[in-house]
Swiss-Prot record:
Protein name: D-alanine--D-alanine ligase
Upper classification of the organism: Bacteria, Bacillati, Bacillota, Bacilli, Bacillales
EC primary class: ligase
Keyword Repeat tagged: no
Organism: Staphylococcus saprophyticus subsp. saprophyticus (strain ATCC 15305 / DSM 20229 / NCIMB 8711 / NCTC 7292 / S-41)
Coiled coil location: none
Residues binding ATP, per UniProt: 167-222
Gene Ontology cellular component list: cytosol
Cofactors that this protein relies on: Mg(2+); Mn(2+)
GO MF term (any one): D-alanine-D-alanine ligase activity
Binding site for Mg(2+) 2: 306, 308
Swiss-Prot/TrEMBL catalytic activity: 2 D-alanine + ATP = D-alanyl-D-alanine + ADP + phosphate + H(+)
Task performed by this protein: Cell wall formation.
UniProt keyword list: ATP-binding, Cell shape, Cell wall biogenesis/degradation, Cytoplasm, Ligase, Magnesium, Manganese, Metal-binding, Nucleotide-binding, Peptidoglycan synthesis
């Protein structure tokens, strides 16, 4: 049986560039190379596209994925066919943050009519933008913590009024977040006005829009979702932190987190979380995969925090670990995602693009 052509795309013009490379290393070492002919495309921090074909060896040196000695190519040509000369069965974008997880590259794949793993333009973009995401959750009736959002230009013009709004609506501690970044990049926990001002300036280095959320004493619970029109969910897992704030450094550099899978919760609470994860999946019209993040208080109040349309696949990542607990191996999970991409593309072919 001939191998299917699959292309892994990673890197990207994003502050989460290095996380994407780490994710790509994990996926490349787990994907079934007996079933798939693997090509890779690395997008540099400057936006250049570099391609290497027929990856068969284990990737031990992560820096080799930066393809330093490879010349940049023309995007449409790089994506037009695989190393076997056939079109790709699917492209797997392992891109985190802006210019990759936000609907931009999904739009490119749509225009080129290439099957791709994961969410479409709408779901990717709305899951990336924390404010839009919150508005969609509110429309779906999902419970959330209070928040305030504003633009960089508004803050520079009306700083006093905005700080007053934050103090009127929220209580310390609060979390300041860039609206369009993940992996906890640019996020600050603030306990007073001085920290708030510093956190706002930090967040505005990464985005023109930010969200300030009410802090809460609660457990951080996550649910993985997999599927297209009829998604399945996992039992919830819990993020156990050795630090007060689960930031980028704690996540990816210090390893100061532990995953408790399944989470120690009442079954009724677990089922509520799973149902809410499906509601979040549908609220943003997702396809393929999603990770839904929640807060659960000691008295079992549940608040949805956010969703991640392209969860990490690193050795520390919750998403593949949750599915492994459900009996789905890492390699099989990748296979399922590729099959879902093909299914989504076949479904799209039923659409008419002209009027008879």
């Amino acid at each position: 049986m001939a191998k299917e052509n699959v292309c892994i795309v990673y890197g990207g013009k994003s502050a989460e560039h290095d996380v994407s490379i780490l994710t790509a290393q994990n996926v490349l070492n787990a994907i079934d190379k007996e079933q798939y002919q693997i090509d890779i495309i690395y997008i540099t921090n400057d936006g250049a596209w570099k391609k290497k074909e027929n990856i068969v060896d284990t990737i031990n040196d992560i820096d080799s994925l930066r393809l330093i000695d490879v010349e940049a190519g023309e995007i449409s040509k790089l994506l037009s066919q695989g190393s076997t000369g056939n079109a790709y069965s699917a492209v797997f974008p392992l891109l985190h943050g802006p210019n990759g997880e936000d609907g931009t590259i999904q739009g490119l794949f749509e225009v080129l009519d290439i099957p791709y793993v994961g969410n479409g333009v709408l779901a990717a973009s709305s899951s990336m933008d924390k404010l839009v995401m919150k508005q969609l959750f509110a429309h779906r009736g999902l419970p959330q913590l209070p928040y305030v959002s504003f633009l960089r230009s508004e803050y520079h013009k009306y700083e006093g009024n905005i700080l007053k709004l934050v103090h009127d609506k929220l209580e310390y501690p609060v979390f300041v977040k860039p609206a369009n970044l993940g992996s906890s990049v640019g996020i600050s926990k603030c306990n007073n006005e001085e920290e708030l001002k510093n956190g706002i300036e930090e967040a505005f280095q990464f985005d023109r829009k930010l969200v300030i959320e009410q802090g809460i004493e609660a457990r951080e619970i996550e649910v993985a979702v997999l599927g297209n029109d009829y998604p399945e969910t996992t039992w919830p897992g819990e993020v156990i932190k050795e630090v007060a704030f689960y930031d980028y450094k704690a996540k990816y550099k210090d390893g100061k987190i532990k995953l408790d899978i399944p989470a120690d919760l009442d079954e009724e609470v677990q089922m509520t979380l799973r149902n809410m994860a499906v509601e979040a999946f549908k609220a943003t019209d997702c396809a393929g995969l999603l990770r839904a993040d929640f807060f659960v208080t000691d008295d079992n109040q549940i608040f949805i925090n956010e969703t991640n349309a392209m969860p990490g696949f690193t050795a520390f990542s919750m998403y593949p670990s949750l599915w492994e607990n459900m009996g789905v191996s890492y390699s099989d999970l990748i296979k399922k995602l590729i099959e879902l991409a093909k299914e989504k593309h076949e479904d799209k072919k039923q659409n008419k693009y002209k009027i008879d």
